[in-house]
Amino acid sequence: MNQEIMNLFNPTTPAQVFDQIRISIASPEKILSWSYGEIKKPETINYRTFKPERDGLFCARIFGPIKDYECLCGKYKRMKYKGIICEKCSVEVTLSRVRRERMGHIELAAPVAHIWFLKSLPSRIGQLLDMTLKDLERILYFEYYVVLEPGLTDLKERQLLSEEEYLRAQDQYGQDSFTAMIGAEAIRELLKGLELEKIDAQLRVEMAETDSDIKHKKLAKRLKIVEAFRYSGNKPEWMILTVVPVIPPDLRPLVPLDGGRFATSDLNDLYRRVINRNNRLKRLMELRAPDIIIRNEKRMLQEAVDALFDNGRRGRVITGANKRPLKSLADMLKGKQGRFRQNLLGKRVDYSGRSVIVVGPELKLHQCGLPKKMALELFKPFIYSRLDAKGLSTTVKQAKKLVEKERPEVWDILDEVIREHPVLLNRAPTLHRLGIQAFEPVLIEGKAIQLHPLVCAAFNADFDGDQMAVHVPLSLEAQLEARVLMMSTNNILHPANGQPIIVPSQDIVLGLYYLSILREGLPGEGKVFGDLAELEHALHAKVIHLHTKIKYRWDSLDDEGKPYKRLIETTAGRILLGQVLPKSVKLPYETINKLMTKREISSVIDQVYRHCGQKETVIFCDRIMALGFFNAFKAGISFGKDDMVVPASKWKIVDTTRTLAKDFEQQYNDGLITHGEKYNKVVDAWSKATEEIAKEMMKEISAVRKNASGAESQVNSIYMMAHSGARGSPAQMRQLAGMRGLMAKPSGEIIETPIISNFKEGLSVLEYFNSTHGARKGLADTALKTANSGYLTRRLVDVAQDCIITQDDCGTSLGIKMRAIIDAGTVVASLGSRILGRTAGEDVRDPQTNEVIVKKGELMEERDIEAIHQAGVQEVKIRSALTCELVNGICGKCYGRDLARGTPVNHGEAVGVIAAQSIGEPGTQLTMRTFHIGGAAQINEQSVIESNFEGKVVIKNKAIARNGENHNVAMVRNMVVAIVDPDGTERATHRIQYGARMHVDEGDTIKRGHRIAEWDPYSRPVLTEVEGTIDFEDLIEDQSISETLDESTGIAKRIVIDWRSTRGGADLRPAIVIKGKDGKVLKLARGGDARYMLSVDAILSVDVGAKVKPGDILARISTESAKTRDITGGLPRVAELFEARKPKDAAIIAEIAGTIRFGRDYKNKRRISIEPMDKEEEAREYLIPKGKHIHLQDGDIVEKGDFIVEGNPAPHDILAIKGIEELAAYLVNEIQEVYRLQGVLINDKHIEVIVRQMLQKVEITDQGETDMISGEQIDKIEFDQLNVKARDEGKKIATGTPVLLGITKASLQTRSFFSAASFQETTRVLTEAAVNGKVDPLEGLKENVIVGRLIPAGTGASMAKIREVAMKRDRMILDEREKQATIVPPAAPEAEPLALPPAE
């Protein structure tokens, strides 16, 4: 008996240790082996006694007792009868929880098809039998017969026969001469009769013979599914069910409510329908009912089973009593409320509470204020145990009473319990890992949680009613992790970019800014102070002001770290600030001897962290916070109406622009410019005016004014707030005191009339109305984008969740080359910022001296970056996640520095999830920030290039002509102007637009800011290369060209119209030709005629017979009017790039280098071919829709990768033509562009990690002698494994090309079916996995969370490692023992005990 009691506390089912999970189709035998009995009746429970009916859906005989250790009739009660089966009610006496584990089954009277294998596309049954889904459904739902065995008749196997045809055939051929069946039995027979090996061989032969691409694809698909069945051990006929499993009753509960009603799971209703129909069918079959009735019943049974498995997948949705669709088994798994996402990936947490947050400026960085009431509730178990240990209570009940009465000793104990016990604070939405941090609680009165101001940025919290949740880590390990990994003091840097995230904001910044202002001419200027006491005395006595320029003897450290004093010129405020700076050689007084804006403060914190370590940084942050708050309060900065200074020159600028706009209107009326050009010019003029007014306003607001005594007066408050970075921006100041400027319509177009007033002057009614567009659009956008951004983050996390650092170094020699990113001549991302914290892929050498700055394989730190910058290195090869050669995960060297710690990355760091959060988090931030600048339009169309460096001009691919107006014009598209140092180093390169006016020539020496070229941003020209007379070809009135009169001006302009849509215009090829004096078409220098093809919407600029010179404009194509760009263009753009979608009007890229030739047109497409330079290559042809403007002419030379038709390139094309490195560079730059526009910093490596995950698959081009199928996509790892196997067997290996998958697709095709199923399309993923008998190796994070294990990252990774080592040791010991056991000495005499091997 005692043993029994002991066993009670042992878990009955031992937790199995497993490393993989396999899924396959359940055979009828398997289903029966799970089952504890057949369910024969649809009854559930007896409504009077509430006891389950026998053989019903809740039967206790099958599923187990309802109460622990008690049979149904009550004959056997208590533990002592454990395991006995009651002879009266046949219930086993055991724990009631077996009702959660035991399954039953329903024996079907007729087989039914499993709807998942039938309807989830592509239909598996259909593919195997090579039949269409429509035909299958006709057979299954009893409309058509199918011929199984034609015998000697003219019928074909698998031919469908309708009822009449079947009867006719029976009459014609006799009843037994052929076999035809109907319903699931027929399909089952067909599946049973399949000879998979034969089909496999046959398909391979057919694939080798076929030329059609579509047929090849179709055969490959079928072959794949045949192979799946061959190798997985599944049998095709198992897709037809003869037995339906019934899940345990406690997983589909029936709960009596008061008033005699019941709450029940929908599954019970669905099961009842199946049982009812099945029983009715059995009865009808026993009664030998007419065929038509039985057939109808069978069809209804099929439908009932369909609804049970997946309600609504076929036919109408079955609804319950309240017209609500019933939740079937598939719905239990699917979607946000399904099993996967609701219960397995996220669980409710015990020991948590939530409350409103308020600011706690007197807290230290590692503390948070916890209301006493809350702490008492959260730490109850700890308090109970402490009360017990101290002997204050003997039972839990007593302890409970003490706590409820809130006795004084309870509070003392609470203090003890809470001491150094960290708690986790979380603010929803948790967009990145800094949304949950650990703090040490400090007990406070009141009911609100107090939060430290410096961590608000990480939580994105403010105190306007935000709430936060508190969680208590219970176990010692959890407390340790909270303290070591999650403590707010350990999260000083942002994981996305390595910048400090514990940065003062708002009041603190304002206070520090005020503290560090220096003003000339204040009383006491030039006084010298020796120590702090003296200075403070002078301040209190008002002899000097905080901002007075003084001299002070400062304690400095020399290079050896020895203290010495030196005299510095500074202000009293900055001395006070200097007192909190940690003493270090690397942090001289100059670090803070300047005006402290938010950016400066951030850089100081960064330096302190780098040079003095974490502890000093935390202390420093707390001190400057206190200093900032104190000085903001002392300064008492506020602003009044007069602080908004409207510039005097405002109206002058407005009037000038008004006249300009009138001029453009007039030009338009005279027909000199089109409506679109007028619109663009007007909008341009007004945005320039707005900028100018804003400049003037800034000049006046920030101007230093002197008062009567010659001292500088106080700085303007508004300017102080904006300039310090505390609140507001120049854009907002412009709206307050400049002019509001242009507004956008909801469609994104800009309204031509600007808002001239500002908020100080007040808006007129019309202006106010115009500005409501922007504000409303902002709010609507915000609501929509939050959801979009969350979804983007979810997809990113899903695709990258199994990316973990698993080794230190993979030893690869591959890498990617990094250069500074220069956009329109300005450096947007310096080389240093891009390679900081990355590993050098090869030695970085000084270009002048050739000495090594950084060795290959070393991490580049700040000092190395400085050296690289000094040496003028332009390009560095670095290791990257993209080129890492590890099979699982990424190596530390390829990843580089852990941005959140500033040290090399640790083993087990989940870099994939960090990357996903770093990219996703600002998405939400940005979308939430659209409405801060009320839709004020910002257009930046760039139309000039100015030099940022001085040097000599070198022009590559030079082709310049002097046109009729005596301007130099760029005549080619690939002309590049480079600015070169005297020592030959390229400082900058600029690609020149076609048709741009050149302001420099080869060999010129230019200064900084010199204009290199300019062009019209609103149209693209077609230029002539030769001098001659104009003639038109195929430019026929109303067929290919139309004179349009502008309604408002009455001036005609000639536009090329779409000639294909006019009658008789299909074969036209509109062009302008240039003829010589003899009337013949001139030849061009590069070969070909001087014939310029025109595209739709080209506006002609010349007439027949006009004389032109090289570089003159023949026609122009206007570009679209400018739309406002904000992150709305941004977020969808990022999603589009990550999803690797083909852009709407994708660019066409040259696959080879060669010469352009125009071929014969095909239907309504232009044919262009490239004659390759390399004679080995084949020529490539492209068909281009005629409306598209092709800016190349016959005979132009293109390089591989050049654009033939402008547009956004499709990422797949870049990968195919230029390779992985170019693709990565393109994606990284494009995505960074969007974030840069918003001023968000994200490290490139995060994007690289995601792109690596998108490149996991290979498309097989040649299958060699392997089992792979050409054209199929297969995992890189699997591809390599199969090739290694083939090479070992001496067979020809397969070849493949890398494929780029969008993140959704990549997530659904991961090696783990658990991860894919819990992401999207659960049914499809599980169906496919089951057919293939897939094994989930449980390598990623999601799969392990789902099966309830520690994740293989972070501390979980080290646990796994330890476990692995232990298992290895165990194995070695066991092997050793076995060895010793085999060498037993010969049997000794009886008397002696046997010599045993020594115990290990």
Swiss-Prot record:
InterPro entries listed in its UniProt record: DNA-dir_RpoC_beta_prime (IPR045867), DNA-dir_RpoC_beta_prime_bact (IPR012754), RNA_pol_asu (IPR000722), RNA_pol_N (IPR006592), RNA_pol_Rpb1_1 (IPR007080), RNA_pol_Rpb1_3 (IPR007066), RNA_pol_Rpb1_3_sf (IPR042102), RNA_pol_Rpb1_4 (IPR007083)
Any one of the GO BP annotations: DNA-templated transcription
Keywords, in A-Z order: DNA-directed RNA polymerase, Magnesium, Metal-binding, Nucleotidyltransferase, Transcription, Transferase, Zinc
UniProt cofactor(s): Mg(2+); Zn(2+)
Any single Gene Ontology cellular-component annotation: DNA-directed RNA polymerase complex
Gene3D superfamilies (UniProt xref): 1.10.132.30, 1.10.150.390, 1.10.1790.20, 1.10.40.90, 2.40.40.20, 2.40.50.100, RNA polymerase II, clamp domain, RNA polymerase Rpb1, domain 3
Positions of the UniProt region annotated as Disordered: 1378-1400
Catalyzed reaction equations: RNA(n) + a ribonucleoside 5'-triphosphate = RNA(n+1) + diphosphate
Xref: SUPFAM superfamilies: beta and beta-prime subunits of DNA dependent RNA-polymerase (SSF64484)
Function: DNA-dependent RNA polymerase catalyzes the transcription of DNA into RNA using the four ribonucleoside triphosphates as substrates.
Quaternary state and interactors: The RNAP catalytic core consists of 2 alpha, 1 beta, 1 beta' and 1 omega subunit. When a sigma factor is associated with the core the holoenzyme is formed, which can initiate transcription.
Name of the protein: DNA-directed RNA polymerase subunit beta'
